[in-house]
Regions:
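Macrodomain-like recognition of ADP-ribose-binding/processing modules
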Residues: 1-261
Length: 261
């Protein structure tokens, strides 16, 4: 099967999955939407509570697993823990290119859950403004996110934090310097941590956020995550990066270390 045939097949699966989620979980989807919260920190205005100072250290794990598998393993090992998956999100489109047949991390989350049905409900109040001309901050985007509780992943429910990393691949073409990009990346990771702590997450499923098509340096991402989450009320940080031979996995292993699975 060629690339386009496979993409068409994935698009058909995405459409069928979305319809099935609507039939099976419309009530649960509506409840998750109602209990979701949009976070922002822009132009000196923010609605994220400053985390209380802590001297606690999180346990750090590096797993050769996709995000959903990692969350399920964590749930099996710690069934009473609150688990949140970081969605490596598109800034402009709910579910990224899920419905067009793409299969990056966000799209994979949508294929495994009712997340796409949830994010569609935010198109007008969240994504539409991001698609307006001049709204992308030269593709660095802004510190904006959606925290959604109880997203259904088959027999499990996990919270999902939807947040786009700065898009260095695009930003570099708009005259953005590497220093500007790194400053935005570090600020966004601080933003993510504050949201996770505000929502009293026990286990956060993170990863090589932004180090795919967005072009972030995985070593830089790993360094900023390691620095920012050094002290945290979150008990366990799982960096979920499929393929131990990948550049991303090797970068995280060198910088973060932790228990490897």
């Amino acid at each position: 099967m060629g690339y386009w045939d496979n993409k068409q097949s994935m698009a058909a699966q995405a459409a069928a999955h979305t319809h099935q989620m609507m039939l099976n979980y419309e009530k649960e989807t509506t409840e998750s939407v109602k209990n979701s919260k949009i976070y922002y920190s822009k132009d000196g205005i923010n609605n994220v509570r400053e985390p209380a100072p802590t001297t606690c250290h999180s346990a750090v794990e590096l797993w050769d697993k996709d995000s959903v598998t990692a969350a399920r393993i964590a749930c099996t090992e710690h069934p009473d823990s609150k688990i949140c998956i970081l969605n490596f999100a598109s800034y402009k489109e709910p579910g990224g290119k899920f419905i067009q047949g793409s299969s990056a991390q966000e799209e994979s989350l949508c294929h495994a859950s009712n997340l796409y049905n949830i994010l569609l409900r935010f198109d007008k109040v969240y994504y539409a403004s991001h698609r307006e001309k001049g709204a992308t901050n030269r593709s660095l985007y802004y510190n904006e996110a959606i925290y959604t509780p109880n997203v259904i992943f088959s027999n499990n429910k996990f919270d999902v934090l939807t947040c786009a990393a700065p898009n260095w691949s695009a930003a570099s073409r708009f005259g953005v310097s590497l220093d500007e990009n790194n400053k935005a990346l570090k600020s966004r990771i601080e933003f993510i941590k504050s949201i996770l702590e505000e929502n009293k997450v026990d286990i956060a499923i993170l990863g090589a956020w932004g180090a795919g098509v967005f072009g972030q340096n995985p070593a830089t991402v790993a360094t900023y995550f390691s620095e920012e989450f050094y002290y945290s009320s979150i008990s366990t940080i799982v960096y979920s990066i499929p393929d131990k031979n990948s550049i991303n996995y090797r970068a995280f292993k060198e910088i973060i270390g932790g228990n490897c699975l």
